[in-house]
């Protein structure tokens, strides 16, 4: 089932969640993956970083994540607890840039650091409702967008990986999400999925 929505606004997300409820009878798992970036230094060659661009990235990556999380949690709270006493699991997506933002990533890095900072608080807020919250902070993954990147972009990123010395596969992100759902003792954690890489300044 595919439902188009705008995570930055309340009504479209409520409508999307209600469609899920109508078809499946409820909601037990929510994985927040929507997001984007904006390359730009705080002081560019001709002008400061556009404020509206910074606000858009924060609104999409951080506020949008919070918006989906709160609306999903409201529906999860109506579930009957499962055999573990759990009503739902929310998995948010951050980035290693939330820890080591590169030059020109101020908006993206700030938005993902916000998601990381939100994780434990959200888990504590929702504990009384038997809803767990975890975050995955992926490194560099071999996505269609990355496959289009030139070698001068890909090679330095690949050099930052440790073992395995390669880009991550989307299936590995999915595997971790499934593990978080299945492991009822994981809560309030941000898990780096990056083969031990640490981002260089550029």
List the model feature ranges, each with a label.
Residues 59, 152-172:
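Catalytic Tyr-x(3-8)-Lys segment
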Residues 69, 111, 119:
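Active-site helix of classical SDR
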Residues 169-193, 198:
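C-terminal substrate-recognition "lid" of short-chain dehydrogenase/reductases
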Residues 74, 123-125:
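Alpha-helical segment proximal to the catalytic Tyr-Lys
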Residues 14, 37-55, 74, 78-84, ...:
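Conserved mid-core segment of classical short-chain dehydrogenase/reductases
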Residues 36, 47-67, 91, 115:
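Catalytic Tyr-X3-Lys loop
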Residues 95:
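Residue(s) in the substrate-gating loop at a strand-loop-helix junction
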Residues 127, 132, 186-189:
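Short, small/polar-rich loop/turn modules that mediate ligand/substrate recognition or access, typified
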């Amino acid at each position: 089932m595919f439902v188009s929505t705008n995570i930055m606004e309340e009504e479209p997300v409520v409508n999307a969640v209600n469609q899920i409820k109508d078809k499946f009878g409820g909601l037990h798992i929510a994985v927040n993956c929507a997001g984007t970036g904006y390359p730009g230094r705080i002081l560019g060659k001709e002008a400061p970083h556009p404020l509206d661009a910074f606000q858009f990235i924060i609104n999409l990556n951080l506020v949008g994540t919070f918006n989906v999380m709160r609306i999903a949690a409201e529906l999860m709270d109506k579930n009957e607890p499962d055999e573990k006493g759990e009503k739902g699991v929310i998995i948010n997506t951050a980035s290693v840039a939330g820890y080591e933002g590169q030059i020109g990533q101020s908006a993206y890095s700030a938005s993902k650091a916000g998601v990381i900072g939100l994780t434990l608080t959200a888990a504590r807020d929702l504990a009384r409702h038997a809803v767990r919250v975890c975050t995955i902070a992926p490194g560099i993954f071999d996505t269609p967008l990355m496959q289009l990147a030139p070698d001068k972009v890909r090679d330095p990123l690949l050099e930052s990986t440790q073992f395995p010395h390669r880009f991550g596969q989307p299936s590995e992100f999915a595997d971790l999400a499934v593990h978080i759902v299945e492991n009822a003792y994981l809560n309030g954690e941000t898990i780096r999925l990056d083969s031990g890489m640490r981002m260089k300044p550029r």
